[in-house]
A protein has these predicted regions:
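Structural motif
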Residues: 62-72
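Mid-sequence acidic-hydrophobic segments that form the walls
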Residues: 80-84, 101-108
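Short, hydrophobic/amphipathic alpha-helical patches that form generic packing surfaces
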Residues: 71-83
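Charged, low-complexity interaction regions
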Residues: 84-90
Length: 118
């Protein structure tokens, strides 16, 4: 999925889709890309140790597992976008959803317990 599609889903979740129809989204695009990169970095390091590269163009694909891209990232982007717009009710609502969903990434990871050899 591309960055633009994640941003579009977040905008739709927030009910800000009327911005697209009025043409007032142009100043909103940089905030949206910043929000996406913030969430992308957050979930990237839950799944990987290194290799993060910021998304610089909304047409770029987001290389994360499918469940992260479709089910987790849009809620985080929505939370940060709501915050940037001063929409505290939506910011709180989507932050809670994002944090609950983000916890599932850690549950899916397996940890191996090893006793060190001396």
């Amino acid at each position: 999925m591309t960055a633009a599609k994640i941003i579009d889903k977040a905008i739709l979740l927030l009910g800000y889709d009327t911005l697209k129809n009025t043409g007032s989204i142009s100043g909103f695009e940089q905030s949206a890309l910043t929000a996406l990169n913030t969430v992308y970095a957050d979930v990237f390091y839950l799944c990987n140790k290194e290799g993060f590269q910021e998304i610089t163009d909304a047409s770029q694909p987001v290389n994360m597992p499918e469940n992260v891209v479709f089910d987790i990232m849009p809620y985080g982007v929505a939370a940060f976008l709501a915050s940037s717009q001063g929409d505290s009710d939506n910011q709180l609502f989507f932050s809670r959803i994002y944090n609950l969903k983000r916890k599932n990434i850690l549950k899916e990871m397996t940890f191996e317990d090893k006793i060190p050899t001396v």
